[in-house]
Regions:
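N-terminal beta1-alpha1-beta2 module of alpha/beta enzyme domains
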Residues: 1-87, 209-212
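Conserved, mostly hydrophobic/aromatic
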Residues: 9, 46, 50, 83, ...
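Hydrophobic or amphipathic alpha-helical targeting/insertion segments
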Residues: 86, 91-137, 143-146, 151-155
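Hydrophobic faces of well-ordered beta-strands that scaffold small-molecule active sites
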Residues: 7-11, 54-56, 90-96, 119-125, ...
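Active-site mouth loops of central-metabolism enzymes
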Residues: 21-37, 95-104, 140-142, 146, ...
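Short, acidic/polar
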Residues: 32-46, 106, 216-226, 288, ...
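An alpha-helical appendage that flanks or caps ligand/catalytic pockets
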Residues: 2-17, 146-209, 242-249, 253-378
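Alpha-helix-loop-beta-strand connector modules within alpha/beta enzyme cores
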Residues: 67-93, 151, 256-258, 397-402
């Protein structure tokens, strides 16, 4: 008998919340991004609420215009190791770049976290959209978008091979016979590829999962192709159910074409629920968040998608400027959507900046309204679950869970 399909839920824990001005909210913890006790409390709450996982993003470049939660934050795998000691069942996932890391180190790091957490680690595989990252890693320039995905494909192939360095029962550890390992169950990788040469084997035994859950976040053509071949779960950001349904269908078909079972490739759109006892209360909470955003911060937030572009010289109330292909080497799918939305709705620069900073979605309302919207996406081919990304933490998450 087929088991019933279950909605999967994770929560993106990003300091004071996803909104650029969230740290100013009365309920916010302004230093949340570097406050271990704060993250421990939120993670325990997520575990008690039976969520599947918590997630921590990362980036490798900042400027004075960056999101406050990005200006100062923990290195995420270190944080996962700490949270593993404080939780029992919930999955622990984090971002790590394939463009500015090496496969052997990444394989060790995630295998270690998987051991420490007793098989609860997840890796959000990114290729690093921020072009300024290159200068922090002794690189002359940021690789082109499609090249980064080619590198990522080989990178993940290597890490998966390294995680299979040892068979499950390779470590005998027999004191009487003096046999520590069975050498027949040790496998050296000897990978020689386009971008990497890695000998192996990995110097840690197979973890409980064998490998972490592999996650990918990207909606570009290259991102979809990559995710459909390697990801167990895909984070995506479609704003409407129609767009989410089209994405869902496309990626499931790609997974099938890649020889995979599409039901094992989970599509998890972002969901920013704002919950109130009445629709009016929920709307008031949205407006309270939106009113915290000043236009300069909104322009900075928008600019980060366009390689930290300075929009201040432009007329705020003129139509959104024509930018051509600018931004596509970083956030390709996101910048394409911004440009298309501005064109379709004839938005001014001011309107586009404010909308991008505090987007309105289908998940604002009473508990029943939000639950019904999520169920509609889940039951109609738009989602296998959701990544909760609350505008303000901890209030937004508490409202949703409670």
């Amino acid at each position: 008998m087929t088991e019933p399909r279950m909605m999967r839920l994770g929560v993106f824990l990003s300091g004071s919340g996803g909104n650029m001005a969230s740290w100013r909210h009365p309920s916010a913890v302004p230093d949340g991004a570097v406050n271990l006790k704060y993250f421990q409390g939120l993670t325990r709450k997520a575990e008690d609420a039976k969520l599947d996982f918590v997630f921590f993003g990362d980036g490798l470049y900042i400027s004075e215009k960056s999101h406050p939660n990005f200006l100062v934050r923990f290195e995420p795998l270190t944080l996962l190791a700490a949270l593993a000691m404080d939780t029992t069942n919930i999955g622990l996932a984090a971002t790590l770049s394939t463009t500015y890391s090496d496969p052997y180190t990444v394989a060790r790091q995630f295998s270690s976290v998987d051991h420490l957490s007793n098989g609860r680690a997840g890796w959000n595989i990114v290729t690093s959209p921020l072009e300024g990252s290159a200068a922090n890693y002794n690189k002359p320039e940021h690789p082109q978008h499609d090249l980064r995905y080619r590198m990522a494909g080989e990178f993940v192939e290597i890490t998966k091979g390294l995680w299979d360095s040892w068979e499950d029962d390779a470590f005998v550890r027999d004191k009487e016979s003096g046999v520590f390992i069975d050498p027949e169950k040790l496998h050296r990788l000897d990978h020689k590829g386009e971008f990497f040469n890695v000998q192996g084997p990995l110097n840690i035994s197979r973890s409980k999962q064998g490998s972490p859950v592999l996650i990918q976040a990207g909606s570009s053509e290259a991102g979809r192709g990559f995710a459909s071949k390697v990801a167990d779960a895909i984070f995506t950001g479609q704003a409407t159910r129609a767009d989410a349904t089209a994405f869902y269908k496309d990626v499931k078909q790609r997974a099938t074409s890649a020889g995979r079972n599409p039901s094992e490739v989970l599509i998890l759109p972002g969901c920013g629920p704002i919950v109130g006892d009445t629709p009016e209360e929920a709307e008031a909470k949205y407006q309270e968040i939106a009113n915290l955003v000043v236009i300069d911060d909104a322009l900075n937030y928008l600019g980060r998608y366009f390689n930290d572009m300075d929009f201040s010289p432009y007329d705020l109330d003129a139509p959104f400027p024509e930018l051509g292909d600018f931004g596509r080497n970083g956030w390709e799918s996101t910048t394409d959507k911004i440009k298309q939305l501005a064109k379709d709705e004839n938005l001014s620069l001011r309107e586009m900046a404010l909308r991008s900073t505090t987007p309105r979605n289908e998940f604002i309302g009473t508990p029943a309204q939000v639950a019904n919207s999520m169920q509609a996406w889940f039951e109609n081919g738009a989602a296998d679950g959701f990544m909760l990304n609350n505008s303000v933490l901890p209030q937004g998450f508490n409202d949703f869970v409670d």
